[in-house]
Amino acid sequence: MNTNPKSTLPPRADFARNLIAKASAPAKQMRSVAPPARGFTMKVSRILLAVAAVASCAFRAQAQQTTLRVGHFPNITHAQALVASQLSREGKGWFEQRLGPDVKIEWFVYNAGPSAMEAIAANSIDLAYVGPNPALNLYVKAEGEEVRIVSGAALGGAALVVQGDGRLSKPADFKGRAIATPQLGGTQDVAARAWLKKQGYRITQLSGEVMVLPTPNPDQLSLFIDNKLDGVWTVEPWVSRLEMEGKGKIFLEQKDVITTVLVASVKALGARRELVKKFVAAHLELTEWINKNPDEAKRMANAALKVITKKAMPPELIDHAWPRLTFTTELPKGGLEAAVAEAQSVGFLRGKIDLSRLVTSP
């Protein structure tokens, strides 16, 4: 998976430049010799012209091609990205077919939202599938100048999973316990802190009466299995893995909250708005296709996860996780406002937040 794309000169263009440079270099002082036969000279000239023509075509093709860089996570909550990236690998690119032959899609994988939003701000990617809270954080931090939500993607699929031995059976049991989340400031991190605060616990970003530990999803699973975590607030497929591999049980499930949105950078919207518009339309079609073809969508999502994580998920695990999600491009009324309120309650956002520019239709 790409992490730092850069343009490279087409091999044919390199060859042409070297050949033309050699042909154009000043001749060395030599003894007088008979000139080459006219036929030989014409043959070399034809070769040079042909190579130059090939190089010119390569340069034009490269100059005309537009690349859209799209970020996502290795989570089932990002099923549209998993399915589309797998179709790209299989030579059946969903977005490529709908955006045209002059558009290339490059996929980039992140562990959680804050990292993806750093990439948006750095102009390293153009669009991303991400949770609402990291998008909100960047929107507020940049005073609305960096990111826009252009579509919904998924609801649900997030939960608090606790050890199955009964140590956490009610909110009062959480004092002094350790709960992991995917990344500081991410959607599940904010949800965990906000919920714990509502239960009366003192929670800070670095300490508190309950330890909230930002930890990458793969590490969460191994630490949970080793009994070094009391609970994990995360998303599918990790919720199901914690249940099935870690023998955990769901304490609290978020069934209807916004889990994933599709965002675009303000820079991409300014420079290539029509292309972003086509991408969003294709995303809508893909969401509908996933809902109509769940078995094929699950197969492709699992194939993509195998490429990214180097390990395929058991089909029964995917089957267990899938029904917990609703794939939709709609944003439920009040969903973003609720996310803002949670982030404000735990200090990630402060003051009055103007959301009037956050959501846009390209």
How should each PLM-predicted stretch be described?
Residues 1-67:
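Short, low-complexity disordered leader/linker segments with a strong preference
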Residues 64-214, 230-236, 253-256:
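Short, glycine-/small- and polar/acidic-enriched structural segments
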Residues 142, 166, 201, 206-209, ...:
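Pocket-lining segment of extracytoplasmic ligand-binding domains
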Residues 39, 43-51, 59-109, 337-362:
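N-terminal hydrophobic or amphipathic helices and topogenic motifs
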Residues 77, 91, 116, 131-134, ...:
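Stable alpha-helical elements in mature extracytoplasmic
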Residues 101-105, 203-209, 306-319, 350-357:
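Short, surface-exposed acidic
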Residues 272-350:
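Secondary-structure end/capping motifs
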